Curated annotation (Swiss-Prot):
Name the record gives this protein: UvrABC system protein C
InterPro entries, per database record: GIY-YIG_endonuc, GIY-YIG_endonuc_sf, GIY-YIG_UvrC_Cho, RuvA_2-like, UVR_dom, UVR_dom_sf, UvrABC_protein_C, UvrC
Biological process according to GO: nucleotide-excision repair; SOS response
Keyword DNA repair attached: yes
PROSITE patterns per record: GIY_YIG, UVR, UVRC
Molecular function as annotated in GO: DNA binding; excinuclease ABC activity
Native source species: Brevibacillus brevis (strain 47 / JCM 6285 / NBRC 100599)
Family assignment from sequence similarity: Belongs to the UvrC family.
Record's keyword terms, sorted: Cytoplasm, DNA damage, DNA excision, DNA repair, Excision nuclease, SOS response
Listed Pfam families: GIY-YIG, HHH_5, UVR, UvrC_RNaseH, UvrC_RNaseH_dom
Length: 593
């Protein structure tokens, strides 16, 4: 077992959930569920196993997990994940078994039934339930509490249910549409989480019956309360509306933010994405900035609905994307956002726990990297990456790692000035020239190693500037990526050649962290620059708006949308006259039409 796996096992949460085992290629080879993740996942790596399980364990090099709030949710999520990923070590349900739902039929005299098919028949569906027995228990409870029609075919006389007070007998007596709708609404509210209100009502009736010494009646109420508690554990993993939706939650701690995106497709949660990064502004603003960037390049693959935490601002995102974006305050959707947020919080805790364990290994990895490259220990590493879209708004960025740790105060951003069009080599030459000619001029210490995001061409461009223009001999290596844009190969030498470095080594992990961090930093800078240019250009078209006023307007209003919705009076407090205010409002509203 590798040391990284040991560290992850040490910080597993004491909660229910699903785990996804991965092999060396990152392929999900097994999905399982657990009442207690910590105990179940650790059990794979302790004690003896049968031949089949031992074969599975021998292939596991990594895992991830999703925390839920109950064993039932874990069961249903496991089914969804298995069907989505088709792990080769899982026993698949070849008959494509589906879970049962409770249905309120769309009839003049509606009734309750159990079904395994969700149809577009204007009926109401609730579930799924882990098995037919649980669904049947819920239906029996509802049958006792709400007197909807019970018989599939209308009899000619009242049945026993009527005499028990469990049916209004529409077969004999007239039951209005209003009365039926009232019962349907009550059942819907009950199944959507309103059963706590029914429990409270039954509790009051139980206490009153006991006070009146009607002990049999009190016992009946008590049994009904127990039935509700036994069968109404909320399930958040599946919806019945088959809508594609993304659920996003976030958590912050120690200057880091973790964002979890749960993908629900056709009503089933099938995948999640976890991203952690240091943040520098306000929590909400940086979160919404990430979400906006997340969907920036996904206009053709958007879900029908996005669910966000309450502290976010969904209106602007909804206007931009043209889809439903909500910050639910209650109900099932709110519970899903809470689950995403809880998973983000746990992921951050795991991250910090692992970071606290890898200090010694990180320092050792720095020493080993120097040995592998045949250079002195690279205590200070500077890494570069470029970003542009078809040559527009080209930028570059540099990050610094000191003894294997990011040194954020040393990060630098560069706007490319001398290169036109999509010339990555030219951009690399310019930024290396600007960076190290300045260090020479200011007599600042040079880095021990330069890391370039790219292959032979980028490395050669950087080395040419350093050696032939500046007379500097600093080791330069490059990190090439594979077709999935993942760190794949370390390049070094003159000419640059691949370096034999195991992908599961801590040295490779260190380089991967450096590449991911510089890429994140430059992409964020590029998007900020591009967004600023796009927003600024709309105001620049208005006579009388210069850079100073533009900054003042954005500082006060925060967005073009709020400027567009403002009144002339709102501009006066900024010292902007009525005439110019009207021009601003009119111009922005014209652009919006």
């Amino acid at each position: 077992m590798n040391s990284s796996l040991k560290d992850k096992l040490a910080v597993l949460p004491d909660k229910p959930g699903c785990y996804l085992m991965k092999n060396a290629s990152g392929e999900i080879i097994y999905v399982g569920k657990a009442k207690v993740l910590k105990n179940r996942v650790r059990s794979y790596f302790t004690g003896s196993h049968n031949g089949k399980t031992q074969l599975l364990v021998s292939e596991i090099v990594d895992f991830e997990y999703i925390v839920v709030s109950s064993a039932i949710e874990a069961l249903i999520l496991e089914c969804n994940l298995i069907k989505e990923h088709d792990p080769r070590y899982n026993v698949m349900l070849r008959d494509d078994k589906t879970y049962p739902y409770i249905k309120i039929t769309n009839e003049a005299q509606p009734r309750l039934e159990i079904t395994r098919k969700v149809l577009k028949d204007k009926a109401k569906y609730f579930g799924p339930y882990p098995n037919a027995g649980d669904a049947s228990e819920v239906k029996k409870l509802l049958d006792r509490l709400y007197p909807l029609r019970k018989c599939r075919n209308m009899p000619k006389q009242v049945c026993l249910y009527y005499h028990l007070g469990q049916c209004l007998a529409p077969c004999v007596y007239e039951v209005s549409a209003e009365e039926n709708q009232r019962l349907v609404d009550q059942i819907s509210q009950f199944l959507d989480g309103g059963h706590e209100e029914m429990k409270q009502t039954l509790t009051e009736k139980m206490l009153q019956a006991a006070e009146n010494m009607e002990f049999e009646r009190a016992k009946e109420y008590r049994d009904q309360i127990k039935s509700i508690e036994a069968v109404m554990e909320k399930q958040k993993i599946t919806f019945t509306d088959t809508i594609d939706r993304d659920i996003i939650g976030f958590a912050v701690e120690k200057g880091w933010m973790c964002i979890q995106v749960f993908y629900m497709r056709k009503g089933k949660m099938i995948e999640r994405q976890t991203t952690s990064f240091p943040y520098y502004g306000s929590e909400t603003e940086d979160f919404m900035s990430y979400v906006s960037q997340f969907y920036y390049d996904k206009q053709n693959a958007l879900p029908k609905e996005i669910l966000l935490p309450q502290e976010s601002e969904p209106e602007l995102l909804a206007e931009w994307l043209g889809i439903k974006v909500h910050a639910p305050k209650r109900g099932k959707k709110h519970e899903l956002v809470k689950m995403a947020t809880e998973n983000a919080r746990i992921a951050l805790q795991e991250k910090f726990a692992l970071m606290s364990k890898d200090d010694a290994r990180t320092v050792q990895a720095v020493h080993n990297l120097g040995h592998i490259l045949g250079i002195p220990v690279p205590h200070r590493i500077e890494a570069f990456d470029n970003s542009n879209i078809q040559g527009t708004e080209p930028v570059s960025a540099m990050i610094v790692f000191t003894d294997g740790r990011p040194d954020k105060k040393e990060y630098r951003k560069f706007k490319i000035k001398t290169v036109e069009g999509p010339d990555d080599y030219g951009s690399m030459r310019e930024v290396v020239r600007r960076r190290y000619s300045r260090l020479l001029k200011e007599n600042q210490p040079m880095p021990d190693l330069i890391v370039i995001d790219g292959g032979k061409g980028q490395i050669s461009a950087a080395m040419d500037v350093l050696e032939n223009e500046l007379g500097l001999y600093i080791p330069v290596c490059g990190l090439a990526k594979d077709e999935k844009h993942r760190t794949a190969q370390l390049m070094y030498g003159d000419p640059p050649e691949p370096v034999n470095l195991r992908r599961d080594s801590y040295e490779f992990y260190l380089l991967q962290r450096i590449q991911d961090e510089v890429h994140r930093f430059v992409i964020t800078f590029h998007r900020q620059s591009r967004t600023k240019t796009m927003l600024s250009s709309q105001l620049d078209e208005i006579p009388g708006i210069g850079e100073k006023r533009r900054k003042l307007l954005f500082s006060h209003f925060g967005s073009l949308k709020k400027m567009r919705e403002a009144t002339v009076e709102d501009f006066r407090q900024l010292g902007i006259g009525d005439k110019l205010a009207k021009e601003i409002i009119g111009h922005l509203r014209k652009l919006d039409t």
